[in-house]
Regions:
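Short, glycine/charged-enriched secondary-structure capping and boundary segments
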Residues: 1-3, 24, 118, 141
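A short helix-turn-beta junction within AAA+ P-loop NTPase domains corresponding to the substrate/partner-engaging
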Residues: 1-11
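Conserved C-terminal "switch" segment of AAA+ ATPases
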Residues: 11-78, 83, 87-88, 160-168, ...
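Alpha-helical architecture
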Residues: 47, 104-105
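Short pre-active-site segment immediately N-terminal to the catalytic Zn-binding motif
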Residues: 92-102
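Soluble catalytic regions of large protease machineries
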Residues: 102-104, 111-247
């Protein structure tokens, strides 16, 4: 609180160049294979702290030991990153042939859109090996950005919808596998409309939904800063964005 400390030091998470430097430090003394590209791994680990990156290198070394190798290869870093971010592989999970096929087409839908959309981050890896709660994952290499355009968010939503659309095109029906994609897409569309002023119909207004009084929302109000008409318009705009990007 004010008065106890005169200086407030903000330590942000490392960016790509800084992550590369951290990975190099923790790789000292470890034998690296010829295919290891720490620069690519630095780009593929946004949001990781220095401790996370140290753990990543240690996990990669453990994967190499389990393979009986004297060198850490690229596959070890990939497996380590998947484990740190998603969790351990679920070898006990047995999918039937139809589920594997659906997962493959689902991730393929994401991958195709990541490749062709002009504002999407470049495709890095696609897997249908179950890890954590995911049956498959499509990885991209995000650029270091500090501001984001409406077109970028639209492409993120479109890519999220890609798995669902691919399943519909191939199987003619939908399943519950797109739940996380829909949650991500809806969350982005909601913030585009409510917080970032990216809806022409609603206009340049922002409602974060985080303004609360002491001990919770003011009991004398509904906790909402806008009218029922505006709420209806917001819902319509969120739905419009999602449907447009699904097409």
């Amino acid at each position: 609180r004010p008065g106890r400390f005169d200086r407030q030091i903000i330590v942000p998470l490392p960016e790509s160049d800084e992550r590369l430097a951290i990975l190099k430090v923790h790789s000292i003394g470890k034998r690296m294979g010829q295919d290891v590209d720490l620069d690519t791994m630095a780009k593929a680990t946004p949001g990781m702290s220095g401790a996370d990156l140290a753990n990543l290198v240690n996990e990669a070394a453990l994967f190499a030991v389990r393979r009986g190798s004297t060198h850490i290869e690229r596959i070890d870093f990939e497996n380590a990153r998947d484990r740190v971010v998603l969790g351990a592989s679920r070898e006990s999970l047995v999918l039937n042939a139809e589920e594997k096929r659906a997962t493959a087409y689902h991730e393929g839908g994401h991958a195709v859109l990541a490749t062709v959309l002009p504002h999407s981050d470049p495709l890095h890896k696609v897997t249908i090996l179950p890890r954590g709660m995911a049956l498959g994952v499509t990885w991209t290499l995000p650029a270091e950005r500090h501001t984001y355009s409406r077109e970028f968010f639209e492409d993120v939503i479109c890519k999220a919808m890609g798995g669902r659309v691919a399943e519909m095109m191939v199987f003619g029906s939908l399943n519950s596998g797109a739940a996380n994609d829909l949650e991500q897409a809806t969350g982005i569309a909601r913030r585009m409309v409510r917080e970032w002023g990216m809806s022409d119909a609603v206009g340049p207004m922002a409602w974060s939904g985080q303004q609360q009084v002491f001990l919770g929302e003011d009991l004398m109000t509904s906790g909402r800063e806008y009218s029922d008409e505006t709420a209806r318009k917001i819902d319509e705009e969120i739905g419009r964005i999602l449907l447009e990007q699904e097409k």
